[in-house]
Amino acid sequence: MDASTSNQAVVFSTQTPYPLPSQKYMIPTTWRRYHLSQLVNKALGLAKPVPFDFLVKGEILRTTIAEWCAENGVGEEETLEIEYIESVLPPQRLSEFPHESWVSAVSCSLPTHFLTTAYDGHLRAFDLSKNVTLDAALHSAPITSFSVISSTVDTYKLATSSLDLTAQISEITLGEPQSSSSNKVLASLHLHTAPVSSIAANPSGTQLLTSSWDSLIGVWDTTIPPKHEVPEPTITAADQRTKKRRKVDPSSGDSSSPTAIRKAPLTVLKSHIGRVSKVAWLSPTQGVSCGFDSTLRTWDVERGLCTRTISASEKPFLDLAVNVENQTALTVSTDRTMTLYDLRTEEALSAAAGSFLHPATPSCVATTPESSYQVVTGAYDGVVRVWDTRSTKAAISSFKAWDGTKKVLAVDWKRGVIGIGGEGGLDVWKVGLENETQGLSKESQRSA
């Protein structure tokens, strides 16, 4: 080591399964992330190296220690507290699934299939070999979102929401080959007088929440009643002509299927004063929503009451994702930010520590079950960004799903892969730890 090299006192901490003994280390200030990661691995004597990133005062270290200290005014006599976290592998494209229509929502939660909904009103299922195993016309207008209610072997009960002013409960069977797959609309949910923007099933699959541009949130059970709970709407001459066209056009979805039971809501939640853009479950009895009225609201679903309102000045919200364990919510808005909120208070987790800037409007956000801190956003500039909420200055990684200016409209992050939906169809990328994605990666790469 060069005698002129200075050292910095460092204390390490971590929330990973790889803690170091509590002691002070004298680290050469010329060291970067790679050197620190080597130090941790050697000190722990790990049989298989584990790559780490390092957080210094809420910022991921991307320079030498000396450069970081100079930029932040930290002297050599001070002791740096550095937290290390497991590194996220560089994003790697696994597969692409072309669509003729824009993809509005995507799910990576099924072990053997990817699900998408699109602006043509269809729900589609793809196996890991990129085969279409189901193509179901469910709605007569673009589907805005969907949620898996329950499953048994290859049969799934799903809920969908649409711009056709309705939501639905459907049952699908995913078979091999496609001819053995099937779908059936079980019930249509009738409440809203404007497009239904989102739908969410609770973890037990017993209740649903719907949000709409009419400012209302509907609470529904998922049982299918023996008879209709809502009268059939009056059909005008124009509606009759449209219905006749649908009978001869199998590609047109029809939420008014004669076999579907018309359901009424259990409760209607009222508090928003503008479009509600997204709703989600926070607990078995609590919901959370965001809207164009620049508010984030929590709900006591059983009592039908708004329990907390978080207001943000001129910040119309487009999407949200919740972390149930931490009782936090991440929102994306038209002011080109993602913001982290503690739902136990009425404020963001401080303006400095809670906002994540984007160069273009972020349209969607998703958390991952594998981490309490990692999150992915998709934006109208076509860029997907992976973040660690402990570091607000820059994304961990970013990549373009498609060439050109195609917008990202939906993201999902499960089992170490990110599903990306939008104007370019569906793309699936490997983003995560090696052991999370190994099996899926091999299967997807064989089919690429």
From Swiss-Prot:
GO terms of molecular function: ribonucleoprotein complex binding
Repeat region (WD), residues: 98-136, 191-230, 271-309, 312-351, 357-397, 403-439
Pfam families: NLE (PF08154), WD40 (PF00400)
Major location (coarse): nucleus
Compartment(s) where it occurs, according to its Swiss-Prot or TrEMBL record: Nucleus, Nucleolus; Nucleus, Nucleoplasm
Source superkingdom: Eukaryota
InterPro entries named in the record: G-protein_beta_WD-40_rep (IPR020472), NLE (IPR012972), WD40/YVTN_repeat-like_dom_sf (IPR015943), WD40_repeat_CS (IPR019775), WD40_repeat_dom_sf (IPR036322), WD40_rpt (IPR001680), WDR12/Ytm1 (IPR028599)
Subunit structure, as described in the record: Component of the NOP7 complex, composed of ERB1, NOP7 and YTM1. The complex is held together by ERB1, which interacts with NOP7 via its N-terminal domain and with YTM1 via a high-affinity interaction between the seven-bladed beta-propeller domains of the 2 proteins. The NOP7 complex associates with the 66S pre-ribosome. Interacts (via UBL domain) with MDN1 (via VWFA/MIDAS domain).
HAMAP family named in the record: WDR12 (MF_03029)
Family in the record: Belongs to the WD repeat WDR12/YTM1 family.
Name of the protein this chain belongs to: Ribosome biogenesis protein YTM1
The species this protein was found in: Coprinopsis cinerea (strain Okayama-7 / 130 / ATCC MYA-4618 / FGSC 9003)
Gene: YTM1
